[in-house]
Amino acid sequence: MEDRRSKSDEQFVAHFREKYDARLPVWALTELMELGQLSILYRGLRQQDAEEIARAFGAPTKRIMASWLASLNYVRNVAAHHARLFNRKLQHAPARPKTGQVPVLDHLRDVETPKGVFGTYSALAVIAHILPSIDPETDWHRRLVELLRAFPASPALSVSSIGVPHSWESLDLWR
């Protein structure tokens, strides 16, 4: 973090360097952190603070939110390195909340196949659930549905390769 802080050309970092000492307040420090670092920081938070953050993003517990962050960090890294994500088995699949904790994600518990549990779909479902807490006007979920509908039909590779459940498009999460 020291290296990122010292090399940062962000205006708020320069302001703190000039006006105060080298120690950045936590809100400024988190702006410089990578997603993986934020995930680690989150796991180290006090239970009460972590649960407040989890609730803000629609996660029922600190454990679930920590799992989601680790999974999204993994997905982000795969995508950033231009690796195949489509039908990949996720090494860090997002934890599935207990039935009733997050009703729009209850369908994730109905699946026990490796594709259903560890497929890319589970991460996409978590993203679709979290995004409205960041941007209530998001239409990302609708655009994803359209993108997957446009996927070419092929016996060798289909949308089911990512672990989508039967009739997934009719789920409330995607409407």
For the regions a language model picked out, list residue spans one by one:
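Long, contiguous internal "core" modules enriched in hydrophobic/ aromatic residues
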Residues: M1-R175
